[in-house]
Amino acid sequence: MRAGEVQSVAFRNVPSFVVARGVAAAGIEVDVAYGGAIYAFAPASSRGLRVVPEDLPELIAAGRALQRELEGTEIARHPEDDRLSGIYGTVFYEQVGPLHQRTVAIFADGEVDRSPTGSATAARTALLIDDGSIGDTDTWRADSIVGTTFHARAIGSTPEGLLTEVQGTAFRTGRHRFYLDPRDPLGTGFVLR
């Protein structure tokens, strides 16, 4: 807080871990990691692209192709909870500096996140520490394709994976008030499986 305004927020994520490295998919090699969801990561240069708005249509097409090819494979299976299985998104990145990357996260049906994506940043942290690109105590910076920034670092580990903290800017978006009518038979939600 500064002058009564929130400057940034941070969250501690679920254990993050490397799923696989060097997986051939859609004509390139990707690394796959989990950080709350499973993501495929590749350098934008592997497609002859950069993480810039001008290349966004090609990045989206490449991300969707990767997701389609990997979906349903053993790589996309969460090792402990099948409900968490599936390639949630693909992330293309480019190195800006030793502890600084520019990323774009493509998810769902070709949607692009305005942020570097918290769960993807946590997964990327696991990959970077695993390959020695960053040290266990380093904080690294992820910029999104539109310039929003996260800072991430490892804060510990468990048998399930690396514990990470992701910090970014925050802006008030509104006030929300929810009501629960006691007569609503589905007011507390439902699950169909």
Model-derived segments and their meaning:
Residues M1-R193:
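Active-site proximal loop and beta-alpha junction motif in alpha/beta enzyme cores
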